[in-house]
Amino acid sequence: MNLHYLIQEPKIIHEKNPVLILLHGYGSNEEDLFSFAPELPNDSYVISVRAPYDLQPYGHAWYAIHFDADENKFSDNEQAKESVALIASFIEEIVKQYPIDTKNVTLIGFSQGAILSYATALTYPEKIAKVVALSGYFNQDILPEVIDTKAISHLKFFVSHGTVDQVIPVDWARKAKPALENLGLKVAYHEYPIGHGVAPQNFFDFKNWLLR
């Protein structure tokens, strides 16, 4: 495997089971979102992936974030694109290793993981069915120059954000819905009165959305 991961096997076994792939945020690790696993749909594999870049003294990132002298923040978009390709090849590997329904692959990303979930789904739509993007934003700079709207037409998105998020402003998150709808996609968009995190109601709402 090209990426380290934790896995929870489904409790209800089908010939092929859905998979929920969890992508953590900057500076975190695969154990963070895996705490959701016991509460997620029990017919699904739950796989929580560790990002490839080590941070000091601990934690991991999908791509570097740099600051200039004025504290402006810059994402390493080339690294981000490389991580998108890594996630796509990781999906190819796990569907060979486990009896996974390749038509039922969901990405659940938080923060930096959400940013990459958007990009992975729109770059490799044949591998993804649904995206849950928690506390992230839609980064146009890491998307393909040309998006085939027919190839992505099956994709469904659940997008949520905290209205008092100090890490990624809610205004950034709000741009995702019109951007995705302009591509002809269905988007469920929710806001919660919290900061940079996942409120219990947020979890409840995206879990119910997954079960539809």
Locate the predicted segments by residue.
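A conserved short beta-strand
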Residues: 126-138
